[in-house]
């Protein structure tokens, strides 16, 4: 594919994503929903140090020799009140009795209609000889609200809601990782795409993990809100024409308010991250028109993380030949900064293996 045709294809795919985002219902936030929050206090009040317990269901099938497919469930706490907001769910591909193999958690993006990409990654990781799991974020997939599309309602003009549901997502993933560290493997890793990339980076900021890969991550939600929202959404919240909407008289005022409110879910608020930068890889599509590539480059520099740049868009980067293999090899590899750093929980009895 010639360069100009590839660029056109990448931009067309990103335009389709922006069109979908622009079709989401928008409600003006109530006063007081954009109060500033201290990033460190915000996460100190989380469940990261006291993760929810995980229950493991019976084996569903043996798709690959030596691999068991299990459903993971557990309690969840967040701003929503529906059933899907109160319980987490994940699907794991496990190799019983093999603590020596790494465990990789795969996290999907915003509005994911199905887990096809994440399931494909899990199957490929299992075939490589790893444990793997994919998790459904609040309001997505098996946790969606009845009668609405997957992911609708996750991102809101109510900034306190948005930061709280992102924290809930990080807590849910942390619960699965804590279980995996205790029951499954001595090494745990995370891979996320777009919104899932943000979740992966926030996990890296707060927890000492063995390997992290973030593909086209939403590194700076505040900047994306101000500079990347679809035109229809910008008009609905009053951010068109240089205005600041409900957050201020102009864009500069709104930038300060939104930045202070969403600071806890901006990865670069945390320096240095709990996971050393040598274990973190950020995949940067330089043509990204959905979240923008600038914050990815800045974060990689701030954290001294690996930066893999491709002349692709937010969606087309997922189809780059060889990238999937490169990411999977990164996730299962032992990195030079790993020795003695990641906290090791005492191995459990692995009771799931006989359930």
Regions found by a protein language model. Name each.
Residues 1-77, 345-355:
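N-terminal targeting or regulatory segments adjacent to alpha/beta-hydrolase or S9 domains
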Residues 82-95:
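A short loop-to-beta-strand scaffold at the N-terminal edge of the catalytic core in hydrolase folds
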Residues 100-109:
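Short beta-strand element of the alpha/beta-hydrolase
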Residues 111-115, 119-167:
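Cap/lid segment of the alpha/beta-hydrolase catalytic domain
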Residues 170-186:
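Conserved acidic catalytic loop of the alpha/beta-hydrolase fold
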Residues 191-200:
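Gly/Ala-rich beta-loop-alpha elbow adjacent to hydrolase catalytic centers
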Residues 202-254:
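Hydrolase active-site cap/lid region
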Residues 249-342:
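Serine-hydrolase catalytic core
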């Amino acid at each position: 594919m010639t360069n100009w045709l590839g660029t056109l294809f990448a931009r067309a795919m990103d335009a389709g994503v922006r069109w979908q985002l622009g079709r989401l219902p928008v409600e003006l936030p109530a006063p007081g929903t954009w109060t500033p929050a201290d990033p460190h206090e915000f996460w100190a009040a989380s469940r990261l140090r006291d993760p929810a317990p995980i229950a493991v269901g019976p084996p569903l099938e043996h798709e690959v020799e030596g691999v068991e497919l299990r459903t993971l469930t557990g309690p969840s706490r967040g701003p929503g009140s529906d059933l899907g907001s109160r319980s987490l769910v994940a699907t794991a591909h496990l190799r019983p009795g093999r603590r020596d193999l790494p465990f990789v958690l795969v996290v999907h993006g915003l509005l994911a209609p199905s887990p096809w990409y994440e399931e494909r990654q899990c199957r490929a990781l299992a075939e490589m000889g790893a444990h793997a799991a994919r998790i459904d974020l609040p309001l997505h997939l098996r946790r969606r609200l009845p009668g609405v599309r997957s992911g609708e309602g996750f991102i809101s003009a109510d900034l306190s809601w948005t930061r709280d549901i992102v924290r809930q997502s990080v807590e849910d993933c942390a619960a699965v990782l804590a279980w995996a560290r205790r029951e499954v493997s001595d090494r745990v890793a995370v891979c996320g795409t777009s919104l899932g990339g943000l979740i992966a980076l926030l996990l890296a900021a707060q927890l000492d993990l063995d390997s992290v890969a973030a593909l086209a991550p939403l590194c700076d939600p505040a900047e994306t809100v101000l500079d990347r929202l679809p035109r229809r959404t910008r008009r609905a919240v009053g951010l068109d024409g240089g205005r600041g909407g409900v957050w201020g008289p102009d864009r500069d005022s709104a930038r300060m308010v939104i930045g202070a409110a969403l600071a806890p879910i901006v990865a670069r608020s945390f320096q240095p991250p709990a996971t050393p930068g040598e274990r973190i890889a950020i995949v940067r599509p330089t043509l990204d028109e959905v979240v923008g590539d600038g914050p990815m480059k800045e974060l990689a520099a701030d954290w001294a993380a690996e930066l893999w740049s491709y002349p692709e868009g937010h969606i087309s980067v997922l189809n780059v030949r060889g990238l999937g293999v490169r990411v999977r090899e990164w996730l299962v590899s032992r990195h030079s900064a790993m020795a003695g750093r990641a906290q090791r929980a005492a191995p459990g009895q692995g009771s799931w293996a006989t359930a």
